Amino acid sequence: MKSVQFCFLFCCWRAICCRSCELTNITITVEKEECSFCISINTTWCAGYCYTRDLVYKDPARPNIQKACTFKELVYETVKVPGCAHHADSLYTYPVATECHCGKCDRDSTDCTVRGLGPSYCSFSDIRE
């Protein structure tokens, strides 16, 4: 019986601790209007689960803030998009997360929606690696 309890507690601990908010590698699609195609770039972003709850009774004095896995620290890197016209600005700057935490989603810098375009969206038909 104790081994069953231990296994249950171990599985719960693993589900909570090992799926926390952490840095992960992703591929994003970058596009420049002047270049008429997209390229894929590997970068680092935050992903994982954060403890959150939704109150049954809404209290106007206590705002309900859902925590999301988001960046705590960012740096920016710049890549040159190959094949652009000579008159076009071929440099593209993108964010790279260096530290993550569970916190309020900043709508000024992050797509906080459930149904965003996603990192692989390209408005052009030509995607280059």
Swiss-Prot record:
Chief site of localization: secreted
The UniProt record lists the keyword Disulfide bond: yes
SMART domains: GHB
Keyword DNA damage: no
Pfam families assigned: Cys_knot
Subunit structure: Heterodimer. The active follitropin is a heterodimer composed of an alpha chain/CGA shared with other hormones and a unique beta chain/FSHB shown here.
Record's function text: Together with the alpha chain CGA constitutes follitropin, the follicle-stimulating hormone, and provides its biological specificity to the hormone heterodimer. Binds FSHR, a G protein-coupled receptor, on target cells to activate downstream signaling pathways. Follitropin is involved in follicle development and spermatogenesis in reproductive organs.
UniProt-recorded name of the protein: Follitropin subunit beta
Species this protein is from: Ovis aries
Phylogenetic lineage: Eukaryota, Metazoa, Chordata, Craniata, Vertebrata
